[in-house]
Amino acid sequence: MAARRRPRSAVPRRVATLSVHTSPLDQPGAGDAGGMNVYVVEVSRRLAERGIAVDVFTRAVSSDLPPVVEMSPGVTVRHVSAGPFEGLGKEELPAQLCAFTAAVLREEAQHEPGHYDVVHSHYWLSGQVGWLARDRWSVPLIHTAHTLAKVKNAALAVGDRPEPRARVIGEEQVVAEADRLVANTADEARQLVDHYGADPRRTLVVPPGVDLDRFTPGDRTAARRRLGVAEDAVVLLFVGRIQPLKAPDLLLEAAARMLADDPALRDRLQVHVVGAPSGTGLEAPRQLEQLAAGLGIADLLRFLPPVHVELLAEHYRAADVAVVPSHNESFGLVALEAQACGTPVVAAAVGGLRTAVRDGVSGVLVEGRDPADYAAAIRAVLARRELLSAGARRHAGAFSWERTVDSLVAAYTAAAEEMAAASQRAVPGTLLRPAWALGGVRALGAQVAR
């Protein structure tokens, strides 16, 4: 007989957040850490501030990591041992999902039934784990994809590998089973419906936010002084992981075109790249250095490692323009952070960047991949920088993590109420399971049986 569960409130008391492949404790801008890490950190902190406890489950990548870390009051990061600590690429993680899921279920089994009220999974790997946890705990699964394989494969960069069929199938399963699908933008919501057959009634748009207390306008001259940048320099800034998808090479080609059109810029133009290698293909700083040398702009290129948020804000303030030339972005938090600091953005007119940047008001969106078009857009921003800077601040001010969390809590509550109502009408039947778990569910259930 199943254990008796405590009565649930529709408003959650505790959320199990799943982030299998990357930890909220990792430094964004390196390896697999990026905007999703920022999202998990900011949302978790603000949920905790509202009295909703959060446990973040992530795969341990070192034996030195403590099993449990209090990230902030009310937010606990739980490092799960699942497979070798080191040497596993993201594409190898599906084989570790059974072990990861077993550990998550064991943790919940140590508590009174009904310990978690909601599961919120991030990325498709976590969604597969969340699907099984949802069925076992009888709680709603909220899923945020962050990126979608079908969309990424339609916009592959040179040197990048297509996402495997297994991921596509896994995403389709999670989309079919999640109680709510959270899309960053209306474009992403349409992609979920059109490419994955998502139920529009369960798909909601919740834009990410920006920390408006940390990313603020400031004195550009003072920021440059602190960073050792000449006051009269023209600084083009790229922030993010150095990988084909992010296309830092396109920024270098645009800078070379600017110099070809105006050689007098050579003494002032600088290209700052803040980030570290990730992914495949054109990923190493050395390769970007070789490209810069071939373009004749090696002396303009400056690499900086990923930095803490306070110093990152200084880099945004010191820049004339932030450039986000990605092949695709589900949103583009970097663009929003730059604008919050008063720095206008030149970005690709793709995906969520069409929402993150307001064309002609907070920056310029560029159609296509022609470096000449990017060079022209950068020049246009430089010519109107003060006006666009004011527009950037106003635009970013409309996005806050508080609004994001307002919408998420409403989604959690609505999904819980819907599940409670459905349970009154339920007819016993067979639950589907994730494909990777078929054949292993009985053993997994035995490991976590109460």
Swiss-Prot record:
Describe the protein's quaternary organization and the partners it interacts with: Homodimer.
Q: Which organism is it from?
A: Geodermatophilus obscurus (strain ATCC 25078 / DSM 43160 / JCM 3152 / CCUG 61914 / KCC A-0152 / KCTC 9177 / NBRC 13315 / NRRL B-3577 / G-20)
Query: What is the official name of this protein in its record?
Result: D-inositol 3-phosphate glycosyltransferase
Annotated NCBIfam families: mycothiol_MshA (TIGR03449)
Residues annotated as coiled-coil are none
Binding residue positions for Mg(2+): Y316, R317, A319, T343
Describe its function. Catalyzes the transfer of a N-acetyl-glucosamine moiety to 1D-myo-inositol 3-phosphate to produce 1D-myo-inositol 2-acetamido-2-deoxy-glucopyranoside 3-phosphate in the mycothiol biosynthesis pathway.
Q: Which InterPro entries match?
A: Glyco_trans_1, Glyco_trans_4-like_N, Mycothiol_biosynthesis_MshA
Positions binding 1D-myo-inositol 3-phosphate in this chain are H21, D32, A33, G34, G35, M36, N37, K90, Y123, T147, R167
In alphabetical order, the GO MF annotations are:
acetylglucosaminyltransferase activity; D-inositol-3-phosphate glycosyltransferase activity; magnesium ion binding
Gene for this chain? mshA
What this protein catalyses is:
1D-myo-inositol 3-phosphate + UDP-N-acetyl-alpha-D-glucosamine = 1D-myo-inositol 2-acetamido-2-deoxy-alpha-D-glucopyranoside 3-phosphate + UDP + H(+)
